[in-house]
Amino acid sequence: LFGKGDDRFEPVDFPERYVIVTKKTQTEIERMITAKIIKLPGHTNDSIGLLFENRVLFCGDAAMNGIPSRNHITIWIENLKDYKASWKKMTQLDFKKVYPSHGKPFTKEQLIKYQQKLQKVHLYLLG
């Protein structure tokens, strides 16, 4: 896999659309969106997921389900240690189905099945 941060892309910035999650604001935001905010760093240091009451997890870019991903592992990882910890955290949550940012939804069992593949992941510095 390729990764290691150091983005070289021009940022797209819409500050008027920001939702800033802090210890003070998190509970209110979770109430408004009716989901629990789960920190899932690794893909990026500020990656999050949303766990809904109907046992659905929106995991953002913490997992994928489609080309070019293999085994539901995202193709860009900034911090492999954090990424592995986030997968472990996801497997310990109470949900039935995962909705990734890229690809079709899949089951918690599939996430658990491919967790062992993370041990073989190596990052290569770009540039």
Please give the residue ranges for each predicted region:
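Active-site HxH/HxHxD metal-binding segment of metal-dependent hydrolases
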Residues: L1-T27, L118-L123
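Short coil/loop residues immediately preceding or within conserved phosphate-binding loops
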Residues: K23, M32-A35
